[in-house]
Amino acid sequence: LPAIEAALKTKPIDGRITLSGYEGSELLVARLLIESGADVRYVGTACPKTAWSAADVEWLESKGAKVQFRASLEQDLAAFEEFKPDLAIGTTPVVQKVKETGTPSLYFTNLISARPLMGPAGAGSLGDVINAAMKSKDRFDEMRDFFEGVGEGHAAGVWEDVPKDERTFRMKEKRKRITAEQ
């Protein structure tokens, strides 16, 4: 374990993180992040609470992390809103929502849990991935500003031409439906 501890110290993580997933390794990853210096405020997992997770939960909570078992998407997103992390690690819908705000985010399954985390090389490489993502905040802001409004509201969906905002048409159709229902 001293070799893993040394590897974690060579690439410290300085930032607030929320983490959520459904794989079962969320508590382990959160511990590695905290041991690397990260401020992990929330750990959500789809897995149930078991006797085997008790020691990890106790340790994580002693470090200020809220652990949510059988976490829902709504709970994961609420944690993001509450803790305003520098980086959110999560499932596809979490990452999608977080990126819309211009906050860096990583897919837990593809970029974190798929990594070999045991041993000095695996645990030590976690810092590279996390730090690189947190440094991309400016790029996320540029992308958010560039794409703002695209695919939202009247422009949502697939279009052959430039979408037109047909609010008056929709209002007329809504009135027709309401009248027909009465």
Predicted regions and their residues:
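An N-terminal assembly and electron-transfer interface module characteristic of large anaerobic redox
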Residues: 1-182
